[in-house]
């Protein structure tokens, strides 16, 4: 008896039966071709902006390359988009927490205080561009080192309190899209934010930065001057513009700015702008030499007067001549009176009064 009759089940499918079933399935290539051909029946809808940028980046002929140098350049480069930086003018009062000196191209700020940076461009950069801020040492003997916070301030941050790594000097305030990077080749720290166009009625974009360590901290900057490099880059890392300025993190920004500006003007041979001299109107007459005689009696001191107008001069001259004549007459009267008094004096007991330069009679 056959097994099929005993169990009451159909025999298993053979290889020929499986091939017959597979041939009944539609061809996947033909299905995709039909679906692509059916796209012509739908109206043309524009792609999203993000998709357009993505296709341009993927289908472009030029392959973007990111340049990473051990010593970043500090030369200003506006680029074809005209990158410019501006700062708020806060003066040099003692109460300011952040002030910028255009003469020195230097920013003075306090620890962990807000430093508004105004970014301006002449034409909008490509979509998805970023602004990168990097701190480097200014002097050549220190430029190879990475700018970091001192161990004291680095340990003062509680884990999870700040999104930035504890060793990073710079922070971005009020922007949740900011992200912090460390270069794999040089180890330099940087903070990046997406570039956002100016708001309606404004000409610049504001980015709020913080410096989280003093310039005088031991183990950190250790009184070594630093520079901040602001670069405008594409999403692929291509440089579009660069600006640079010096930074000093101190306790009294206004005082330090005045001191450094005065020292700078002295080196250039100019007078500090702290005090202004009174402006005197120009005079056509040549200045007369000042004459002063050192005498004992105040009445014998000689003064020089500058008189405006010929008539006034003649009148005062006549008055002066009259006073001098009166003085000479008074002296003559005193001399005559003294002589008369001397002649009226008679010697006692018949003796002749001796006069000066007169010899006595010989006996």
Curated annotation (Swiss-Prot):
Q: What's a single GO BP term from this record?
A: cell population proliferation
Region called Basic (repression of DNA-binding), residue ranges = 344-356
Question: Site Interaction with DNA: which residues?
Answer: 94
Positions of short motif Nuclear export signal: 314-325
Chain segments carrying region Interaction with DNA: 248-255
The protein's required cofactor(s) are namely:
Zn(2+)
InterPro entries to which the protein is assigned, alphabetical: p53-like_TF_DNA-bd_sf, p53/RUNT-type_TF_DNA-bd_sf, p53_DNA-bd, p53_tetramer_sf, p53_tetrameristn, p53_transactivation_domain, p53_tumour_suppressor
**The keyword ATP-binding belongs to this UniProt entry's keyword annotation:** no
Q: Where is this motif: Bipartite nuclear localization signal?
A: 275-292
One GO cellular component term = nucleus
What positions does the DNA-binding region cover? 76-267
Oligomerization, as annotated region? 300-331
Compartments, record wording:
Cytoplasm; Nucleus
Instruction: Report, as the record phrases it, the tissue specificity of this protein.
Output: Ubiquitous.
Q: Bound how, and how many: what does the cofactor note say?
A: Binds 1 zinc ion per subunit.
Pfam families per record: P53, P53_TAD, P53_tetramer
Keywords from the named record: Activator, Apoptosis, Cell cycle, Cytoplasm, DNA-binding, Metal-binding, Nucleus, Phosphoprotein, Transcription, Transcription regulation, Tumor suppressor, Zinc
- Similarity annotation: Belongs to the p53 family.
Name of the molecule in the record: Cellular tumor antigen p53
Q: Which organism is it from?
A: Xenopus laevis
The organism that produces this protein has a lineage beginning with: Eukaryota, Metazoa, Chordata, Craniata, Vertebrata
- What would be the name of the gene that encodes this protein? tp53
